[in-house]
UniProtKB/Swiss-Prot annotation:
Keywords: Oxidoreductase
Catalytic activity: L-methionyl-[protein] + [thioredoxin]-disulfide + H2O = L-methionyl-(R)-S-oxide-[protein] + [thioredoxin]-dithiol
Domain MsrB: 3-126
Family to which this protein belongs: Belongs to the MsrB Met sulfoxide reductase family.
Record organism: Lactococcus lactis subsp. cremoris (strain SK11)
NCBIfam families: peptide-methionine (R)-S-oxide reductase MsrB
Highest classification ranks of the organism: Bacteria, Bacillati, Bacillota, Bacilli, Lactobacillales
One of the Pfam families matching this protein, by short name: SelR
This protein's name: Peptide methionine sulfoxide reductase MsrB
Length: 142
């Protein structure tokens, strides 16, 4: 999708986050304190990224997940911006900036914390997976 089409499709915040590597404000975003059962997909492409089963309250101010639904759905990139070194997380197909992954997550779940911008995500409630075209992902909740 071309940049001009994306600007029309996305909110200004979602565009800034996904296309310009922006970061939304902590603690005031849509999914930080949101724990309904369902699937989180890339707001640009709709590619499945995370499930609510892997979401946890990290206290960082952004949605946190212990792992992506499939490692192939995200790609990691070294990020040296803001005078620090981090690992950026991007969606594989649309190349949307999602957030960063850190090694301070729950040890019993692998030790990773995927700190993801709400503005980069669209939530599909569990009871709408089939009607929204994500029926293949119901099995993850069994």
């Amino acid at each position: 999708m071309k940049k001009e089409e994306l600007k029309k499709k996305l909110s200004p915040l979602a565009y800034r986050v996904t296309q310009e590597n922006g970061t939304e404000a902590p603690f005031t975003n849509e999914f930080d304190d949101f724990f309904e059962k369902g699937l989180y997909v890339d707001i640009v492409s709709g590619e499945p990224l995370f499930t609510s089963l892997d979401k946890y309250q990290s206290g960082c101010g952004w949605p946190a997940f212990t792992q992506p639904i499939d490692k192939k759905m995200v790609k990691e990139k070294r990020d040296k911006s803001l005078f620090m070194e981090r690992t950026e997380v991007r969606s594989s197909n649309a190349d949307s900036h999602l957030g960063h992954v850190f090694t301070d997550g729950p040890l019993d779940k692998g030790g990773l914390r995927y700190c993801i911008n709400s503005a980069a995500l669209r939530f599909i409630p569990f009871d709408q997976l089939e009607s929204e075209g994500y029926g293949d992902y119901i099995k993850y909740f069994s």
